[in-house]
């Protein structure tokens, strides 16, 4: 197993638009306080001493990123993304170099806690396949009838988890699994699903449920509340 003090490179896919936010500005560039959501997300990664480099994957022609202080940060590299998230993550991995382990974190997930990140990073010592931050499902889950807004039945929530990010894997393994899944036309919704497709079983590391992804307009106020609370706790 790898040592606990090895350097880690992070990949942040930030090429999405996020139409559900109902704004002209891509959600990662919306502001919470005096920083964009993307800046909050990246700074949470760089706050851990093992994360020494971040690859940010943006859309070709993105003119907003160059206006951020992140554009001149010595630990940040920017590359162009692809059509789908998996294409963008693969482009980021190719820019990582020879890092043994890679974190992948959503650009629009700004409320990552350092204790969750620290627990996830211990997988480089204990696991050969890596894992993800996740939160157990607490709500009652319903499956709809096909094509209808009608309940088919209640789903047993035991054993169900919400997949969060960061997700943390050996670089070569993630690269190979993403490449195979894309070449074979598999549906890849997150990085762990590429490993699952190839027969691996990444670990679930329980994380805080307030590590939310800003997807809809109401999420912005909630993320601002969580971030303000965290900053207050750190300063007291």
Swiss-Prot record:
The record marks 157, 213 as: Positions MEP for the nucleophilic attack. Keywords: Isoprene biosynthesis, Nucleotidyltransferase, Transferase. It comes from Escherichia fergusonii (strain ATCC 35469 / DSM 13698 / CCUG 18766 / IAM 14443 / JCM 21226 / LMG 7866 / NBRC 102419 / NCTC 12128 / CDC 0568-73). InterPro entries: IspD, IspD/TarI, IspD/TarI_cytidylyltransf_bact, ISPD_synthase_CS, Nucleotide-diphossugar_trans. Homodimer. Pathway: Isoprenoid biosynthesis; isopentenyl diphosphate biosynthesis via DXP pathway; isopentenyl diphosphate from 1-deoxy-D-xylulose 5-phosphate: step 2/6. It catalyses: 2-C-methyl-D-erythritol 4-phosphate + CTP + H(+) = 4-CDP-2-C-methyl-D-erythritol + diphosphate. It is an enzyme of class 2 (transferase). The record marks 20, 27 as: Transition state stabilizer. Disulfide bonds: none annotated. This is 2-C-methyl-D-erythritol 4-phosphate cytidylyltransferase. Belongs to the IspD/TarI cytidylyltransferase family. IspD subfamily. SUPFAM superfamilies: Nucleotide-diphospho-sugar transferases. One of its GO terms (molecular function) is 2-C-methyl-D-erythritol 4-phosphate cytidylyltransferase activity. Catalyzes the formation of 4-diphosphocytidyl-2-C-methyl-D-erythritol from CTP and 2-C-methyl-D-erythritol 4-phosphate (MEP). HAMAP family: IspD (MF_00108). GO terms for biological process: isopentenyl diphosphate biosynthetic process, methylerythritol 4-phosphate pathway. Its EC number is 2.7.7.60.
């Amino acid at each position: 197993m790898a040592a606990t003090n090895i350097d880690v490179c992070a990949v942040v896919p930030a090429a999405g638009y996020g139409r559900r936010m109902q704004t002209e500005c891509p959600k990662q560039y919306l502001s919470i306080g005096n920083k964009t959501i993307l800046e909050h997300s990246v700074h949470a990664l760089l706050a851990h001493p093992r994360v020494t480099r971040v690859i940010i994957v943006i859309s070709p022609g993105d003119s907003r990123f160059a206006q951020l202080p992140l554009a001149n940060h010595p630990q940040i590299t920017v590359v162009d993304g692809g059509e789908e998230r998996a294409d963008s993550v693969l482009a980021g991995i190719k820019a990582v170099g020879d890092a043994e382990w890679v974190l992948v974190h959503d650009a629009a997930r700004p409320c990552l806690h350092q204790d969750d990140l620290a627990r996830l990073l211990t997988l480089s010592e204990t696991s050969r396949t890596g894992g993800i931050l996740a939160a157990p499902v607490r709500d009652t889950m319903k499956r709809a009838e096909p094509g209808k807004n009608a309940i088919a039945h209640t789903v047993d929530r035991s054993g169900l988890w919400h997949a969060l990010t960061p997700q943390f894997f050996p670089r070569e393994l993630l690269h190979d699994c993403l490449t195979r899944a894309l070449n074979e036309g598999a549906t890849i919704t997150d990085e762990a699903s590429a490993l699952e497709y190839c027969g691996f079983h990444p670990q679930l590391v329980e994380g805080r449920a307030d590590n939310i992804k800003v997807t809809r307009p109401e999420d912005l106020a909630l993320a601002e509340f969580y971030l303000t609370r965290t900053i207050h706790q750190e300063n007291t």
